[in-house]
From Swiss-Prot:
EC number: 3.1.3.16
Cofactor(s) annotated in UniProt: Mg(2+); Mn(2+)
Family stated for the protein in its record: Belongs to the PP2C family.
Annotated keywords: Hydrolase, Magnesium, Manganese, Metal-binding, Protein phosphatase
Descriptive protein name: Probable protein phosphatase 2C 71
Known catalytic reactions: O-phospho-L-seryl-[protein] + H2O = L-seryl-[protein] + phosphate; O-phospho-L-threonyl-[protein] + H2O = L-threonyl-[protein] + phosphate
Amino acids binding Mn(2+) 2: 69, 231, 270
Amino acid sequence: MGYMDLALSYSNQMRIVEAPASGGGLSQNGKFSYGYASSAGKRSSMEDFFETRIDGIDGEIVGLFGVFDGHGGSRAAEYVKRHLFSNLITHPKFISDTKSAIADAYTHTDSELLKSENSHTRDAGSTASTAILVGDRLLVANVGDSRAVICRGGNAFAVSRDHKPDQSDERERIENAGGFVMWAGTWRVGGVLAVSRAFGDRLLKQYVVADPEIQEEKIDDSLEFLILASDGLWDVFSNEEAVAVVKEVEDPEESTKKLVGEAIKRGSADNITCVVVRFLESKSANNNGSSSSEEANQVPTAVRNDSDHKISAKETNQDHTTVNKDLDRNTDSQSLNQKPIAARSADNSNQKPIATTATGHSVSSEQSGLTGEKSQMPIKIRSDSEPKSSAKVPNQTQSTVHNDLDSSTAKKPAATEQSGSTGERNRKPIKVHSDSAARKTTPSIFN
């Protein structure tokens, strides 16, 4: 027995963390570039997923970016990654009323996920932090604690808030629905789940909703870049620190690799996934003649982000104009778009997200004040933040959060299906960097 313990200890000490899978691309109209990096970190399984894609819809070049952090396994995060954006771009009001379309797509995807979960005995769920670029608009939507941060005028601003059960409005909503919030290492819904909004989580669905908070920003010369990341990054980075790193590295792929690598060095115990989108509006405007007609007809460049394909150092250092040749690849593989293996720990960030964005939109929130958790630098605030939670934190020093669900601790509420409006999008061929099935033109699920 002693030998086994020694062998296990030696194995854990010698475990090598693989370099993050990474890639990037440039939009067809030259208005934005992007990069991504993802690593299992110190874990032996991977529950993070991400999506980067560019579509032509009704004459508009549309960018769609997302980070999805699973709990209770990877299947919920993988499902959301496969279906959320496809549901969104086929919504009949995607261009005319994008906010409404986003809300419908979130609730519809959640409803369909719950149906697919009926055969599973163990609950699974996922966060989502998504960014939609349409014309001169940036729309950020999220559920859970995967955060979105922008750099505007050189300063960091959170454009999402982490959904935590101890936030006063979230706790009130949960209790009004018949649920409760209790301390179990951190504040948890039903003593089980450390986020108050998520996809899936069938047994807690009455309290853990997938209703997104949506924030809109104007894309102008002052907007420099956007960071989307799972909490594996935010556990060890403040918003300002992450923005400072990206400022120093012009190439978005290289900046995401640097963020992920530094998060591992700082001791992040979770999977780490990061997407950076750089806005090139001001640069392209100063370019001689802006973009030529020849450039306007080019196919969006891309590097694939299929995580079941291991990206070598040689591939990640190539120019980001490699066109994805795997569009017709069978997407039924269970390992699609998973990054190098790793497991989820859920050490939650103790940071207060920003109260107001650069355009004056309020996005206030409050994190639980847990002793022993990662402290983060103050965030720039433009208006009054949300009132503090009334919940008192017991005198404990636990900081490790476990988002895996124990289905025996909560009753199964009835899941209701959201119906969307009818219609079908007129779409150009999709330039997608993952999920070949999602790249095909599909009829609207809102019919």
